[in-house]
Curated annotation (Swiss-Prot):
A Pfam short name: DUF3663
Signal peptide span: none
Protein's job: Probably plays an important role in intracellular peptide degradation.
Names of the cofactor(s): Mn(2+)
UniProt cross-references to PANTHER family, sorted A to Z: LEUCINE AMINOPEPTIDASE-RELATED, PEPTIDASE B
Positions contributing to Mn(2+) 2 binding: K195, D200, D218, E279
Domain of life from the UniProt record: Bacteria
Residue numbers binding Mn(2+) 1: D200, D277, E279
Name of protein: Peptidase B
SUPFAM superfamilies: Zn-dependent exopeptidases
GO cellular component, one term: cytoplasm
């Protein structure tokens, strides 16, 4: 066992020999991080990334100043997808310790689940992992149903079945009910819907390798929103919430769906498929139909839905779309409280009509005349939300995963978004 490296905090600048912009310095007692009052959490996270890069895999957070958020910021930057790391944590009060332990259990679960190879994490495995996490968080206050394969077709979950039928691993719908009072007549406060594409080849609209190599992470929306529900429960969520995970592989085979196919949904909408790589919206539609049927106050869907959102925001922000300005303000307030990055992008009534088809009511992708791809994708989803003007949030989660490490994050999943959605669910 290696001896732990002490990591301490200071509000004094580093010795001039380290340079005027030095954020950390090394001394006989260990490593000191020099906080300057400007984005201290970001400074700690970036310093932790550098410390990990030095090959230091065992540290102690020593001295004063280590609260819950600073401790978590260090771990967010220190954690990576390879190897093991050990932290001796600073002493926190009971509430702070409980919060840190919840983050370690749940947000690490989200990061590790998204990072898992697709070979190990198919649709059924993803649904079962979600059930296991929520059982741990909620105990007997939850119930669930898993529907898969041909049962989906028989029950008219045609979007999910159509996308997933081309894989040897059957598509799966997880419907989970968190009901803390146990009253079967209790109203549903919120419905959460997650895109769980466990690997996305693009189907017959095949991706290039450079765009396919990270597609094990295309279930990032499902993992993140599952983590958000679990985290809200650990923070005392006392309202009924239902979760729908739409899980499938998007593969090429003799049974895979094709361009020109028409999907007929339970709500009466018909959709022509003109791009099999725009599959996420097709599976989410089924979950949104179920969510709308519950008449909740709030519907939130999360999906790694479009490259257009990444073009606009990079991997630095989650993109928020909604017609509900008050709800957008609440979400942004939750994001600010949790120090997580969200950015609102446009969604207007005209985006709903930018999906023309010659053979169906809707096309699953906009034509070249309508290049706002993230907004038209949100417009598509709105056709499956009964009251889309109020109480609906669509999150195109661009900040879920990074193909390469940066100064603040290792390569792989970030876990961003879990705390914001949990905050929104538990806010009074």
């Amino acid at each position: 066992m290696t001896e732990a490296m002490n990591i301490t905090l200071s509000t004094q600048p580093a010795d001039a020999r380290w340079g005027e912009k030095a954020t950390y310095s090394i001394n006989n007692d260990g490593i000191t991080l020099h906080l300057n009052g400007s984005d201290d959490l970001g400074l700690i996270q970036r310093a932790a990334r550098k410390i990990d890069g030095l090959g230091i895999k065992h540290v102690t957070l020593a001295g004063e100043g280590w609260d819950t958020d600073r401790s978590w910021a260090f771990w967010a930057g220190y954690k990576g997808p390879k190897g093991t790391r050990k932290i001796e944590w600073a002493n926190l009060d009971e509430a702070g310790q409980k919060e840190l332990e919840s983050r370690l259990m749940i947000i690490d679960w989200v990061r590790d689940t998204i990072n898992a190879p697709a070979e190990e994490l198919g649709p059924e495995q993803l649904a079962q992992r979600a059930v296991d996490l929520l059982c741990k968080a909620a105990g007997d206050k939850m119930s669930y149903r898993i529907t898969k394969g041909e049962d989906l077709r028989e029950q008219n979950y045609m979007g999910l079945h159509t996308v997933g039928r081309g894989s040897e691993r059957p598509p799966v719908l997880l419907a989970l009910d968190y009901n803390p009072t146990g009253d079967k007549q209790a109203p549903v406060y919120a419905c959460l819907v997650g895109k769980g594409i466990t690997f996305d080849t693009g189907g017959y609209s095949l991706k290039q390798s450079a765009f396919m190599d990270s597609m094990k992470s295309d279930m990032g929306g499902a993992a993140t929103i599952t983590g958000a529900l679990a985290f809200a429960i650990t923070r005392g969520l006392n309202k009924r919430v239902k979760l729908y995970l739409c899980c499938a592989d998007n593969m090429v085979s003799g049974n895979a769906f094709k361009l020109g196919d028409i999907i007929r949904y339970r709500n009466g909408k018909n959709v022509e498929v003109m791009n099999t790589d725009a599959e996420g919206r097709l599976v989410l539609a089924d979950g949104l139909i179920d969510a709308s049927a519950q008449k909740p106050e709030l519907i939130i869907d999360m999906a790694t839905l479009t490259g257009a959102a990444k073009t606009a925001l990079g991997n630095d922000y989650h993109a928020l779309f909604t017609f509900d300005d008050k709800l957008a303000s609440r979400l942004m307030a939750s994001a600010a409280a949790e120090n997580e990055p969200f950015w609102r992008l446009p969604l207007a009534e005209f985006h709903r009509s930018q999906l023309p088809s010659n053979f169906a009511e809707l096309n699953n992708t906009a034509s070249a005349a309508y290049p706002a791809g993230a907004s038209t994708a949100a417009g598509f989803l709105s056709h499956f939300v009964e009251n889309y003007h109020e109480g609906w949030l669509h999150i195109d989660c661009s900040a879920t995963y990074r193909k390469a490490g940066v100064e603040q994050w290792s390569a792989g999943a970030t876990g961003l978004g879990v705390r914001t959605i949990a905050n929104l669910l538990t806010a009074e």
